[in-house]
Amino acid sequence: AWEEVWICTRENGHLQATGIDARRRKQYLYHPSWVALRNQTKYYRLVRFAHALPKIRLNVEKDLARHGLPKEKILAAMVSLMERTNMRVGNSSYEKMYGSFGLATLRDKHINIKGNTLRFSFKGKKGVHQEISLRNARLARIVQRCKEIPGKELFQYYDEEGNRHSIDSGMV
């Protein structure tokens, strides 16, 4: 049973109820018509994304060729990793609340690089342990350079002034 329950006063409100479950997670109950509409919209967004994908891939390749470790290169490496491994992007709130990680929240300790092989090992969504391997020389070099940047976050970049910054999920 949920605690701290809120129930919509409108019969046709898109959000019908919210509450906190036994594991202290906020849960949402949506109106069935809203769910159907969102699913249909999701399909059309996916079609637009499919049409944009070739250009995205060209931009990723261009950004991977940049010198140094600028933000664009790190984001391109992350997009390439997501495409090749199907890794979720993750976000800091899930890390804080559940101790689970995604690509944007990985730490140096979650990656082992030997030659051209990257081995990711971390607790993912819903506490499922992830073991992901990938052979790619260019990505291995870039991720190794990221790992060498001071700080616990794996994916960081240097700006034009040489200042270090972390990547968050919204940037990806």
Briefly describe each language-model feature range.
Residues A1-F101, R107-V172:
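A positively charged, amphipathic N-terminal helix/segment that binds anionic biomolecules
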